[in-house]
Amino acid sequence: MNVISAFVVNKTITVNDEFNALAIAYARAANMDNQMEGAIQKLNLAKSIARDAEAIGAEMVVARYLGIADFEPTLNTFKNSADVGSRIEVKHTSWRDGHLIVKPSDRDTDLAVLVVGESPNYTIIGWIPVSIAKTPKFKSDQSNSWWVSQINLRPMDSILKGVEWSR
C-alpha cells in the first residue's frame, strides 16, 4: 500500500517482509561482538533485535519508494555502505514526531531519510544530506550526535527530482 501526500509517504510491509526483517535483525545481532556499542538507547538483546527489525522494515519501504525492486537489506556492513542504493542512510524511530538522528560514523556523502512508525505501518517523512545535518544548528548537547527535526527535512518527492541518490 502506498499513500502519498504533499509531504510524507505512508507504506505498509507484508507479514513475510516482517519475518525477513526479523531474520536479518537476528543474524546481525548474532554476528556482532557488542550489540549496544554506539547505541543511544541501551536495550536488552530481544528489544534490540525487535528495534533493528523495525529499522530494516523502514529500509524496505524506502527502497520500494525509490523503485528498487530487488532490495536486500545488508548484513554486517555497518557504516561502510549505504542502507539503500549507494547513498541512502535510513533513520528510523517509532516516535511519530521523532527526529532524524545522525552520528559521527554516518558518511558525509550520504542522504539521510527519516522513517517513523512501527511495523508493519511506516511513514517516510523526508530527507537531508548528512553533511548538512552535521552542522552546529543540529548538534545535540546531550550526546555526540545531530538531531534534525522533521520541519527541517526536505520532502520525499524532491529526492526523486534532480538528486542522484543511486550513484
Language-model segments: what does each one mean?
Residues 1-84, 91-167:
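Nucleic-acid endonuclease domains
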